[in-house]
Regions:
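Short, surface-exposed acidic
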Residues: 42-46, 180-191
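PAPS-dependent sulfotransferase catalytic domain
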Residues: 80-184
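Short capping/connector residues at structural and topological boundaries
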Residues: 62-63, 169, 188
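PAPS-dependent sulfotransferase catalytic core
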Residues: 1-79, 193-204
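Detector for methionine-enriched segments
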Residues: 1, 29-33, 104, 118, ...
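A general structural motif at alpha-helix termini
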Residues: 115, 190-195
Length: 204
């Protein structure tokens, strides 16, 4: 999480703030915190809030085309803003930009449980068994974290979902430090809602 050298910053412009992680790992909560803190966000609002994500999804449709060699010109607009990009798409980001990545981590059993509940609500079939899915996710996260460490265009902060709910202000301060220290940490902490933490393994 070393600071970006001045010459590199002058050449490439402001970094893109990326909120990433597995689906249902707290990425929307992190986006909401950044927005509340005063950071501009890049979202189109096409996917509306629902029972699974009452605060909204904070998605941006062009992101979904990254693995299809879609147009990445929108990244120029994303400099100095936060955009949500799930972990499966991080490896497709061009290295001609700098990225400050807030990477959300959550207990994998809770992630799978939350995903299953969302699929049930939608009436969609579940995929592999829970243990198999958790193992695949663990392998994927290891690969992605290795990828991020090996590329100087990424500055990464790992943020634990449960830690945000236990100490929202402390984690907000860490996120604020990553992105330059100009956000309202108190406002960030206020929007982290423990009431949304519905899928703790102890309650399953």
């Amino acid at each position: 999480m070393a600071p970006i050298p001045l010459l590199r910053r002058l050449r490439r412009g402001r970094p893109v703030v990326v909120v990433s992680g597995l689906p249902r790992s707290g990425t929307s909560m992190a986006m909401k915190m950044l927005e509340a803190g005063g950071l501009p966000i890049l979202t189109d609002g096409l996917r509306e809030a629902d029972g699974s994500n009452p605060n909204g999804y904070y998605e941006f449709e062009p992101v979904k085309q990254l693995d299809k060699q879609g147009d990445t010109a929108w990244l120029a607009e994303a400099r100095g803003k936060a955009v949500k990009i799930i972990s499966f798409l991080l490896t497709y980001l061009p290295e001609s930009y700098d990225y400050q990545v807030v990477f959300m981590r959550r207990d994998l059993g809770e992630v799978v449980s939350s995903q299953n509940k969302m699929l049930d609500v939608r009436g969609e079939a579940r995929g592999a068994g829970d243990d198999r899915t958790s193992a695949l996710y663990a392998q994927h996260l290891e690969q992605v974290e290795r990828f991020l460490r090996q590329r100087p265009c990424f500055s990464v902060l790992m943020v634990d979902y449960a830690a945000v709910l236990a100490d929202a202000r402390g984690q907000a301060a860490r996120i604020n430090a990553l992105v330059g220290g100009h956000l309202d940490v108190d406002r960030m902490a206020e929007v982290a809602e423990p009431a949304l933490y519905r899928n703790r393994r102890a309650l399953l």
